């Protein structure tokens, strides 16, 4: 019984890794719909591993390390491959320049900065009730959400048909991952309204964006999340 209690959260973490790995493989093959399902599964399992570990009081150093390693694939490599695929059709042309490398490899910088962000997070003891910088799951939802909406509906076409915008999006993503900006975490210090109204604004605004914009609303929720976090810096 103790074995199950001590390792149930780790099983969810490994499930996250397994799902993320399948997502990466399918995304490379162009099966972005399968990749989308894998991201959803990984997001759910990433939530469950932490929830179960806290509920069973089974937090461990092993679990923390496994969590970061799994997240590196599901929310580091996968969004990096997303931007790799987004830039794939542009060859080595950028503006009026012919680069000595294929432009698509710049997408993998998202994976590099995700790795750096996860390492920083592991060493930072301050991020209990807020994040410093954009967390990797949110970054994945932003980048893949935009890519998926473009593939399905043509939304964000100005970004995905222009390599300058795509490179700018990658640069912004990389900076946000390691920035010192405080970001809201959906963890509650208390049940008092004054302590939680930024979170309530975020939740209600996010629901409205998805209801109004549909698919395009999913990445816009992350943009809204960044804006709300910037507004309420002093409350964190």
Each language-model region and where it sits:
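Multi-pass membrane catalytic core of lipid/isoprenoid biosynthesis enzymes
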Residues: 9-13, 55-119
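Hydrophobic alpha-helical transmembrane segments of polytopic
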Residues: 12-15, 35-42, 106-113, 139, ...
């Amino acid at each position: 019984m103790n074995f199950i209690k001590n390792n149930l959260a780790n099983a969810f973490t490994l499930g996250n890794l397994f799902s993320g790995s399948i997502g990466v493989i399918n995304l490379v093959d162009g099966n972005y719909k399968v990749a989308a399902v894998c991201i959803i599964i990984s997001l759910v399992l990433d939530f469950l591993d932490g929830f179960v570990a806290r509920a069973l009081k089974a937090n461990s150093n092993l679990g923390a390390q496994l969590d970061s390693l799994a997240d590196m694939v599901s929310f580091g490599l996968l969004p990096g491959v997303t931007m790799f695929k987004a830039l794939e059709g542009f060859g080595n042309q950028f503006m009026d320049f012919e680069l000595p490398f294929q432009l698509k490899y710049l997408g993998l910088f998202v994976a590099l900065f995700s790795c750096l962000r996860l390492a920083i997070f592991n060493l930072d003891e301050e991020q209990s009730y807020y994040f410093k910088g954009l967390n990797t799951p949110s970054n994945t939802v932003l980048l893949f959400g935009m890519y998926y909406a473009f593939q399905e509906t043509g939304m964000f076409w100005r970004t995905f048909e222009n390599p300058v915008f795509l490179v700018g999006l990658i640069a912004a993503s990389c900076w946000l991952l390691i920035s010192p900006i405080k970001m809201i975490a959906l963890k509650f210090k208390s049940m008092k309204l004054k302590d939680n109204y930024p979170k309530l604004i975020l939740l209600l605004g996010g629901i409205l964006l998805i209801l109004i914009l549909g698919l395009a609303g999913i990445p816009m929720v992350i943009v809204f999340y960044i804006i709300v976090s910037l507004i309420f810096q002093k409350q964190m």
